[in-house]
Amino acid sequence: MSEVSEAEKRRILREKRKQKFSKGAGSARLHKITTQQPGGASGDSTVTSAEISDNEGSLQRGSNSGQSTREIDDLLAAMDPPIEPAEPLESAAPEVAFIQQLMKMQQGSATPPADEKAGGLFSPLLERLAEQEAGGAPVVSGEVGVHQFQVRQLKAYMLLLRWAILLPFIYYVMHPGTAHWLHTSRFLHFVMEPRNFFMVFTTFEVASISIYYQVLLTLERTNKVNSLSYSSKLVTWAGLVPDGMLPIDNLQGKVVVALHYWDILSMYLTDLSLCLVAAGLMKYYHAAP
């Protein structure tokens, strides 16, 4: 029973020492414990010199290891470059903010994608978006600026030329009796017949738009600039799609062709609508007393 009680006492003392050391008592607490003798304790319950030396050695090793750990942390902090503050998303463009959110979602995802092929397809797209974001908005050079000015000038000249012909044509179609000289020629009489209006108008539009596009292609070859590459975002975004992601070859080229056809159709529909409005106004004011 005496051995059991001595073992229990040693265990209790050891636990007390550990608690005091964990609370930061340090060597002062150890010195206080070793120098004082409890009044009610027997001689066998005192701490031996071997245990004291072991405890002091462990404390010294712990303090040395803590100091070395702090030195390593200081070295790593000195070696790491300073982190620049990230630019807030509010100051960036909406497209750039969306791209940054996509990149963060891809980098912060801890679970791997279920389909690795899909991830492989989207990775080139995100890389190209990141390259565009890093490069910023394309800088319009002097040659591109001159080309865009020439294209706008060409559109203005063609618009004036078309309506310089269309307005008299609409007037004489709506009022064929005002010009008797038109009946001297069978060709002019055929052109000015109201029932032939849409056929003549469509033929004129096809000819004028063809001339416009021929001159536009000549300007693009001379200046070596594609007009849609700098004026349409659809062409820019189609160029970012990597090959093989969609079952369409040369997606950017097909988008350019589709935009050309849409431009032709929009020009035709715009002129037709304005012609109908002009015809209605001429008929109304000519019929008024």
Curated annotation (Swiss-Prot):
It is a multi-pass membrane protein. This is Golgi to ER traffic protein 2. Residues 1-68 are annotated as: Disordered. Component of the Golgi to ER traffic (GET) complex, which is composed of GET1, GET2 and GET3. Within the complex, GET1 and GET2 form a heterotetramer which is stabilized by phosphatidylinositol binding and which binds to the GET3 homodimer. The chain crosses the membrane at residues 154-173, 197-216, 264-284. Its main location: endoplasmic reticulum. Residues 1-153, 217-263 are cytoplasmic. GO terms for biological process: establishment of protein localization to endoplasmic reticulum membrane; mitophagy; retrograde vesicle-mediated transport, Golgi to endoplasmic reticulum; tail-anchored membrane protein insertion into ER membrane. GO terms for molecular function: membrane insertase activity; protein transmembrane transporter activity; protein-membrane adaptor activity. It holds the Pfam family GET2. Belongs to the GET2 family. Required for the post-translational delivery of tail-anchored (TA) proteins to the endoplasmic reticulum. Together with GET1, acts as a membrane receptor for soluble GET3, which recognizes and selectively binds the transmembrane domain of TA proteins in the cytosol. The GET complex cooperates with the HDEL receptor ERD2 to mediate the ATP-dependent retrieval of resident ER proteins that contain a C-terminal H-D-E-L retention signal from the Golgi to the ER. Residues 33-68 have a biased composition (Polar residues). It is found in: Endoplasmic reticulum membrane; Golgi apparatus membrane. It comes from Eremothecium gossypii (strain ATCC 10895 / CBS 109.51 / FGSC 9923 / NRRL Y-1056) (Yeast). Residues 1-10 have a biased composition (Basic and acidic residues). Signal peptide: none annotated. Residues 11-21 have a biased composition (Basic residues).
